[in-house]
Amino acid sequence: GGGGIPVVRTEAGDYQSVDAVIDKDLSTALLAREIHADILVITTGVEKVCIHFGKPQQQVLDRVDIATMTRYMQEGHFPPGSMLPKIIASLTFLEQGGKEVIITTPECLPAALRGETGTHIIKT
């Protein structure tokens, strides 16, 4: 876990920290949208997103479209405070113009960028 440090600009033009909670996944999606990024990368503790996580029928997700990922989310496959915020941020980014989201571990990121691993969420 961990989160961002919220700051506000004071009247003097300085920045001051404030007590608040920053959702780092949604903040990342917002920043990606603002800079007109085509791809959003979210690193996490697993190489690929799974449904039925930790159960005998666990299934890894390689390439998934928005509609399918939305359905999995609505079915409750992603725990709040864990994978759910990442999925919400991913869908938000794609719905607001992004082209692809990659979710993987930092170690697998180079291979994921080559399309060799990670979960790739696309529009269609």
Predicted regions and their residues:
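C-terminal catalytic "cap/lid" subdomain
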Residues: G1-T124
